[in-house]
Amino acid sequence: MRVVIAQCSVDYVGRLDAHLPMADRLILIKADGSVSIHADDRAYKPLNWMTPPCTFEESAIEDIDGEDTGEKLWLVENPKGEQLRITIAQIHQEIDMDLGEDPGLVKDGVEAHLQELLAEHIETLGEKYSLVRREYPTAIGPVDIMAKNSKNEFVAVEVKRRGGIDGVEQLTRYLELLNRDDLLAPVHGVFAAQEIKPQARTLAEDRGIRCVVLDYQELRGIESNELRLF
């Protein structure tokens, strides 16, 4: 990431020409090749930008006599031939730093948190449900939640934020394995998610797996009536 605060003017040459007159601005040049120009307003929105892939060239600007004016031209061009022509009159501050790979945004409500909340409120799945343990180990990987129902029978629970066919297939494999163990069988299946895709619901119900749509806010103890059991 290259962060530059500079006095500059910007010309966009492409489908429509646009010009930003000389002023102090923030210029961001990211490792992915994108370039954006910002003013001290407009929140996060840039005044102008170029998305990757694009090329970046820097050259000195000379006057008509071939003398160096002290200004720099930054030329950013994409494969379509569109250009950002940034004229740098003066650089006030500049930082060039490798930020490395970003871990991404950790959102409130991802699967790990849903699993934790559902384990804490296991009665969401039905009256007299009890928690056996989270991350119940099997030979093919851990089951998100192992619980017992009102009949004291084991229930394997797969927790997803968005439930698709892959999640149903995964739970099916767990159930097939667990039901081979006479000490556990019969083991029932619950597919729990904030959102369950129609194809996944159809497949789950065809295999005798119960679907539970989770209300994240209700699990957090916030008043809501949106929890639906199917």
Swiss-Prot record:
Pfam families: NucS_C, NucS_N
EC number: 3.1.-.-
GO cellular component, one term: cytoplasm
InterPro entries registered for this protein in UniProt: Endonuclease_NucS, NucS_C, NucS_N, NucS_N_sf, Restrct_endonuc-II-like, tRNA_endonuc-like_dom_sf
Keyword set, alphabetical order: Cytoplasm, DNA-binding, Endonuclease, Hydrolase, Nuclease
GO molecular function terms noted in the UniProt entry: DNA binding; single-stranded DNA endodeoxyribonuclease activity
Locations listed in the record: Cytoplasm
SUPFAM superfamilies linked to this entry: Restriction endonuclease-like
Domain of life the protein comes from: Bacteria
CDD domains noted in UniProt: NucS-like (cd22341)
Enzymatic class: hydrolase
Signal peptide: none
NCBIfam families: PRK03298.1
Family, similarity comment: Belongs to the NucS endonuclease family.
Role according to the record: Cleaves both 3' and 5' ssDNA extremities of branched DNA structures.
Protein name as catalogued: Endonuclease NucS
Native source species: Corynebacterium aurimucosum (strain ATCC 700975 / DSM 44827 / CIP 107346 / CN-1) (Corynebacterium nigricans)
Lineage: Bacteria, Bacillati, Actinomycetota, Actinomycetes, Mycobacteriales
Gene label: nucS
